[in-house]
From Swiss-Prot:
GO MF: carbohydrate derivative binding; carbon-oxygen lyase activity; ether hydrolase activity
Classification lineage: Bacteria, Bacillati, Bacillota, Clostridia, Eubacteriales
Protein name: N-acetylmuramic acid 6-phosphate etherase
Family: Belongs to the GCKR-like family. MurNAc-6-P etherase subfamily.
UniProt pathway annotation: Amino-sugar metabolism; N-acetylmuramate degradation
NCBIfam families, alphabetized: N-acetylmuramic acid 6-phosphate etherase, PRK05441.1, PRK12570.1
Length: 301
């Protein structure tokens, strides 16, 4: 009798890599690259499902809701990674998008024995951050069957939070525990069962779509520029000056002065140059337009 994972797409052997142990270096990387090409096509097939989850999540965010990713192992690490990039890129509070990994942050570097097999641990973790009905919990599990994720989704459903699930198998168990589910079928891994590869890449690409779309909808992007970037190092300071200069048809020197005068707030600096008003007035304009720079510029008195 086979094991409970035998029929999962993520556990099947890949016929294209069965002899990878005797391949040359060039053959190995060509095989990996060939398999990786399939990922974007797999995601393309589930774009309607991704869209539904994004729109439903954004509706929750309008009422103060947060986005919480939960997962174990690679899936958990990817959630933490995506969440941690939101504050520096879009200037949002670190609590708005959070990643929770089974076993805690120590598990980012070293797996914690038994954490992913617990049906109750995620509930405790979600209680710790005071999960509420305005929030969205998105469970990540390449195999679609991680108990930690299932337990977390069940608790989120219980308190009325929105739930989503991302997996890489058909008819995933976690899909049955979420209102919205995404099953990106990338096929067997080059190394059997190594879901840090194609499945992990697929999950990261989907998370990129989710977080980026949400931030765009929140007005954190002007055209395709990250106007809420936090200028916390030399590279980001230069990027901020360039964004301000480009959006206001100003010189880099004028942009630099406005950035300093605004207290390193890119959107405020942009409005200061466009309206010739002071920092306080421009902050008020932004506040009147929900912090959305596009709306603020359209509604400049």
């Amino acid at each position: 009798m086979g094991s409970i994972i035998d029929n999962l797409e993520t556990e099947k052997r890949n016929i294209n890599s069965e002899n990878i142990d005797i391949m040359s270096t060039c053959e190995i990387i060509k095989t990996i690259n060939s398999e990786d090409k399939k990922i974007a096509y797999a995601i393309e097939k589930v774009i309607p499902e991704i869209e539904k989850l994004i729109d439903a999540t954004y509706e929750k965010m309008l009422f103060g809701g947060r986005v919480i990713y939960i997962g174990a192992g690679t899936s958990g690490r990817l959630g933490v990674l995506d969440a941690s990039e939101c504050p520096p890129t879009y200037g949002v509070d670190a609590s708005l998008v959070q990643g929770i990994i089974a076993g805690g942050y120590g598990a980012l570097l070293k797996a914690k024995e038994g954490a992913e097999d617990s049906l109750t641990l995620a509930k405790e973790d979600l209680k710790e951050i005071k999960l509420n009905s305005h929030d969205t919990v998105i469970g990540l599990a390449a195999s679609g069957r991680t108990p930690y994720v299932i337990g977390g989704l069940d608790y989120a459903n219980e308190i009325g939070a929105l739930t989503g699930a991302i997996s890489c198998v058909n008819n995933a168990q976690i899909s049955q525990h979420a209102k919205y589910f995404i099953e990106a079928i990338v096929g067997a891994e080059v190394i059997t069962g190594s879901t840090r590869m194609k499945a992990g890449t697929a999950q990261k690409m989907i998370l990129n779509m989710i977080s980026t779309s949400l931030m765009i909808k929140k007005g954190k992007v002007y055209h395709n520029l990250m106007v809420d970037v936090q200028p916390t190092n030399k590279k980001l300071i230069e990027r901020s000056k360039n964004i301000i200069a480009e959006c206001t048809n100003s010189s880099v020197e004028e942009a630099e002065k406005a950035l300093i005068d605004s207290g390193n707030q890119v959107k405020v600096a942009m409005l200061m140059l466009l309206t010739k008003k002071d920092k306080k007035s421009c902050i008020n304009i932004l506040n009147e337009n929900d912090g959305n720079i596009s709306k603020s510029i359209r509604n400049i008195p």
